[in-house]
């Protein structure tokens, strides 16, 4: 339970991370939605009978997403001063939802060896996980191009810190199975599966950083077949399947060809929500058939807060089973490394600007 709202009491049932981890808003406008089509040969999750033979009782739940998080520069100072307040005022927004997720773009280590030749390498102490939990984050993804910045030693430290913290982290593992395995939880009667993977890796590190067989590392979306297999598997016994991706081109306002190619494949395989980031700026969000896609969440807790890269916010989805009932955007601006929610006219203008980003995505304001 976090320091802001005891919403964890609404989170029922098993909270099962991969074996690696053990047990583990306010906003603007909204769009209305639909029911998604199940994979051929499978029952929709909503039709799965309960053990007693009666229909399961599901109520809508909310999940909030923030963008890229690290703890370098001024953020390390905040973290060292007090992990429980390190994310600043945005914690209240995250804590209002039943679930909250961010992209943890750093290795969790104080040791390791920096990736050779890499211009930017990020690492943070284990208190970074404390900070996320205190801010209301329920699950994070480390599948990104900084998750193994401190190579194998940093990976081992990261996995150990995750186990101790009991904060579920997807997209990373001590072997391939754990890296691709979803985090599972049940909220308001909905069985939720969250998978993390990265489509962005420096060419010279793809082999070393990708989890394969018994080798630890990150879940890579470059192995599309493997990722789609995991989505299909999750679809069979989940009411909502969420895929969190690191993808896109830095500072490019529209989704690139690789994103536009992968998103429909994930929806077809059974994903209900696909959310990602990497570009350091916001990209458009909306419906792709009956699924929901957000192509870019931008920076979130980040030391770079220029005019474009400092625009951020929290995306909150209201979901029941496979239906995304509503999307809401709580805009913020990064000040001193942390997101500060906007109010009044600035908020309304920021929401309108966020909606306008959909223009070059091929996504829709409504499902279907």
Regions found by a protein language model. Give the residues of each.
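Acidic, metal/ion-coordinating pockets
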Residues: 3-5, 25-26, 33-368
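Intrinsic disorder/low-structure terminal segments
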Residues: 17-20, 29-30, 39
């Amino acid at each position: 339970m976090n320091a802001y709202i005891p919403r964890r009491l609404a989170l029922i049932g098993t909270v099962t991370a991969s074996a690696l981890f053990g047990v583990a808003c306010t906003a603007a406008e909204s769009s209305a939605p639909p029911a998604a089509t199940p994979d051929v040969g499978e029952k929709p999750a909503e039709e799965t009978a309960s053990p007693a033979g009666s229909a399961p009782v599901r109520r809508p739940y909310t999940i909030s997403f923030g963008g890229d998080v690290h703890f370098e520069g001024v953020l390390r100072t905040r973290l060292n001063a007090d992990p429980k307040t390190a994310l600043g005022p945005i914690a209240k927004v995250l804590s209002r939802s039943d679930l909250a997720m961010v992209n943890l773009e750093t290795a969790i280590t104080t040791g390791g060896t920096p990736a050779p030749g890499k211009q930017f390498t990020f690492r943070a102490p284990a208190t970074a996980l404390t900070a996320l939990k205190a801010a209301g984050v329920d699950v994070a993804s480390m599948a990104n191009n900084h998750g193994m910045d401190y190579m194998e030693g940093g990976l081992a430290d990261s996995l150990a810190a995750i186990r101790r913290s009991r904060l579920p982290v997807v997209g990373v593992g001590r072997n391939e199975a754990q890296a691709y395995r979803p985090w599972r939880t049940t909220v308001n009667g909905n069985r939720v599966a969250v998978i993390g993977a990265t489509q962005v890796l420096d060419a010279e590190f793809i082999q070393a950083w990708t989890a394969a067989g018994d080798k630890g590392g990150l879940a890579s979306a470059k192995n599309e077949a493997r990722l789609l297999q995991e989505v299909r598997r999750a679809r069979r016994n989940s009411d909502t399947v969420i895929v969190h991706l690191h993808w896109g081109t830095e500072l490019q306002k529209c989704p690139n060809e690789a994103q536009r190619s992968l998103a429909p494949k994930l929806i077809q395989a059974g994903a209900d929500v696909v959310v990602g980031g990497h570009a350091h700026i916001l990209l458009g969000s909306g419906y792709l058939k009956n699924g929901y896609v957000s192509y870019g969440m931008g920076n979130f807790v980040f030391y770079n807060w220029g005019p474009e890269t400092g625009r951020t916010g929290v995306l909150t989805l209201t979901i029941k089973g496979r239906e995304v009932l509503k999307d809401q955007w709580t805009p913020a601006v990064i000040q001193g490394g942390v997101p500060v929610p906007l109010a009044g006219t600035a908020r309304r203008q920021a929401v309108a600007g966020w909606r306008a980003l959909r223009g070059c995505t091929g996504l829709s304001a409504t499902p279907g």
